[in-house]
From Swiss-Prot:
Cell wall formation. Adds enolpyruvyl to UDP-N-acetylglucosamine. The modification 2-(S-cysteinyl)pyruvic acid O-phosphothioketal is found at residue 122. It is found in: Cytoplasm. It comes from Stenotrophomonas maltophilia (strain R551-3). Pathway: Cell wall biogenesis; peptidoglycan biosynthesis. The lineage of its organism: Bacteria, Pseudomonadati, Pseudomonadota, Gammaproteobacteria, Lysobacterales. GO terms for biological process: cell division; cell wall organization; peptidoglycan biosynthetic process; regulation of cell shape; UDP-N-acetylgalactosamine biosynthetic process. This is UDP-N-acetylglucosamine 1-carboxyvinyltransferase.
Length: 423
C-alpha cells in the first residue's frame, strides 16, 4: 500500500493552483441524472471519489466521456443520461463513498424509483441519512429502508414545505435535486448554506431549474417539466485552499494560491490572520506571508457555513501543535473527528482531548515518526505536521488523501517541500 514520506524543515514559497471542489463536483455529477440531454462539467479534479462517482453513473447506464485536462485546469466530463436504465446504486460502490446517496433524489425525480445502499465512506461519526428521507417524503415519495437499502418510489414528486431538523449539506442537496422536477413550488428551510450547495444550485439553474434564495437558509424551487443539457464549471476547493495556506503559515513561508475563491474563506482567513499571517486577496488569488514568524495558537469552534468548517479542523490542530501558546478546538459537527490526535502525539504534539474539545499546547519541535491516516482531513494534518517535524515522517493509508486532494505531493514539492510517494 502506498505511503507518503515527508522530510521537515523547509519554509514553503511560490504559487499553487487550486483544483475544483470535491464537495461540489460529486453532487453536480449526480445532478446530471436529472437532465434529458448531455451535460458538460469542467474543472473536475482527479480524485478517487470522482472516479467512484463516474463508475456509479456508468452502472446506472449513463454514458460518461472524460477529457483528462491538465493539472492546473482539471478535467472536463460529459455525462449523457439518456441511456440510464438502472435505478439501483449497488453496495459495492456506495460502501466506499457516502456521497453516493446523492443519486437518490435525482433518480427518484427523473425516473420515479431509486434504490440506494446505505452509505459508507469516512469513519466520522454516524452521519444519519434521515434528513434525506424525511425531505423526499415531504415531496410525496414513498420510502422504506430494508435489507440495507433505501427504496424510494414516486409517480411524480409534488412541491411541499420542509424544514430540516438539522443543517445537512448532502440532505439539502438531495432534496433540492428532487424538488427541481417536482410538480409545483417547494420551500426548504434550515438549508445548508455552504458554497458547494450554491454551486450545485447554479449548475441546476444552468440546466433550466428555477431556484431562489441561493446562499441562504431558505431555498424556493419552482418545479419544471424537464432539465436540458448544459455546461458548468466547478468552483475551486476552499478546503484545499485552506490546507495550502495553513502549510505556508506553519512553515513560516509565503505562498500565493491561484484559482481560489476568497469570498468563501472568511472564517479560515480570519483565523490565519489571528495566527499572525499577513494576507492579501484579489478576486481569485490569496497570498499569505508568514516569513520569519512562528504562528500564534488560535481557538476555534466548528459549525455550519459561514462559520469555521469542520473540514479545516485537523489542519488547524496541526498548526496549533507548533504554534506559540495554547489553542482550544471545539468540534460540534461530527463525532470521532479527533482520530488524528493519537498520530500527532507520535510526532511529539501536546494535545489533551476532553469530549468534543481538544486543548493543544504549542511545541516548537516535532520529531518525524511513522503515522497512519484515519480519514481524509486527518491525512492532510499529518502531512502538515510532517513539514515541521525533524527527520522523516512516513504516512500510511494515504488512500484517504487521494479521495480529496489532487496531486498534493506534486503541489507541495513545487512550493519547496521535501515529499514523495513510495510503494
Amino acid at each position: 500500500m502506498a505511503k507518503i514520506v515527508v522530510t521537515g524543515g523547509a519554509a514553503l514559497h511560490g504559487e499553487v493552483s487550486i483544483s475544483g471542489a470535491k464537495n461540489a463536483v460529486l453532487p453536480i455529477l449526480c445532478a446530471t441524472l436529472l437532465a434529458d440531454e448531455p451535460v458538460e462539467i469542467t474543472n473536475v479534479p482527479h480524485l478517487h471519489d470522482v472516479v467512484t462517482t463516474v463508475k456509479l453513473l456508468g452502472e446506472l447506464g449513463a454514458k460518461v466521456t472524460i477529457d483528462q485536462g491538465t493539472l492546473s485546469r482539471g478535467s472536463a466530463i460529459v455525462v449523457d443520461p439518456r441511456s440510464v436504465n438502472q435505478h439501483v446504486a449497488p453496495y459495492e460502490l456506495v460502501k466506499t463513498m457516502r456521497a453516493s446517496i446523492l443519486v437518490l433524489g435525482p433518480l427518484l425525480a427523473r425516473f420515479g424509483a431509486a434504490e440506494v445502499s446505505l452509505p459508507g465512506g469516512c469513519a466520522i461519526g454516524s452521519r444519519p441519512v434521515d434528513q434525506h428521507i424525511k425531505g423526499l417524503q415531504a415531496l410525496g415519495a414513498e420510502i422504506v429502508v430494508e435489507n440495507g437499502f433505501i427504496k424510494a418510489t414516486a409517480k411524480r414528486l409534488k412541491g411541499g414545505h420542509f424544514t430540516f431538523d438539522m443543517v445537512s449539506v448532502t440532505g439539502t442537496e438531495n432534496v433540492l435535486m428532487g424538488a427541481v422536477l417536482a410538480e409545483g413550488t417547494t420551500i426548504l428551510d434550515n438549508c445548508a448554506m455552504e458554497p458547494e450547495v450554491t454551486d450545485l444550485a447554479h449548475c441546476l439553474i444552468a440546466l433550466g431549474a428555477k431556484i431562489e434564495g441561493l446562499g441562504t437558509a431558505r431555498l424556493v424551487i419552482e418545479g419544471v417539466e424537464r432539465l436540458s443539457g448544459g455546461r458548468h464549471e466547478v468552483l475551486p476547493d476552499r478546503i484545499e485552499t485552506g490546507t495550502f495556506l495553513v502549510a505556508a503559515a506553519m512553515t513560516g513561508g509565503k505562498v500565493t494560491v491561484n484559482r481560489a475563491r476568497p469570498n468563501t474563506m472568511d472564517a479560515v482567513l480570519s483565523k490565519l490572520v489571528e495566527a499572525g499571517a499577513k494576507i492579501e486577496t484579489t478576486d481569485d488569488t490569496i497570498t499569505l506571508d508568514m516569513q520569519g514568524k512562528r504562528p500564534k495558537a488560535v481557538n476555534l469552534t466548528t459549525a455550519p457555513y459561514p462559520a469555521f468548517p469542520t473540514d479545516m479542523q485537523a489542519q488547524f490542530m496541526a498548526l496549533n501543535c507548533v504554534a506559540d501558546g495554547v489553542g482550544v478546538i471545539n468540534e460540534t459537527i461530527f463525532e470521532n473527528r479527533f482520530m488524528h490526535v493519537n498520530e500527532l502525539l507520535r510526532l511529539g504534539a501536546d494535545i489533551q482531548v476532553e469530549g468534543h474539545t481538544a486543548i493543544v499546547r504549542g511545541n516548537e519541535h516535532l520529531s518525524g515518526a511513522p503515522v497512519m491516516a484515519t480519514d481524509l482531513r486527518a491525512s492532510a494534518s499529518l502531512i502538515l505536521a510532517g513539514l515541521m517535524a525533524s527527520g522523516e515522517t512516513t504516512i500510511d493509508r494515504i488512500y484517504h488523501l487521494d479521495r480529496g486532494y489532487e496531486n498534493i505531493e506534486e503541489k507541495l514539492s513545487s512550493l519547496g517541500a521535501t515529499i514523495r510517494r513510495v510503494p
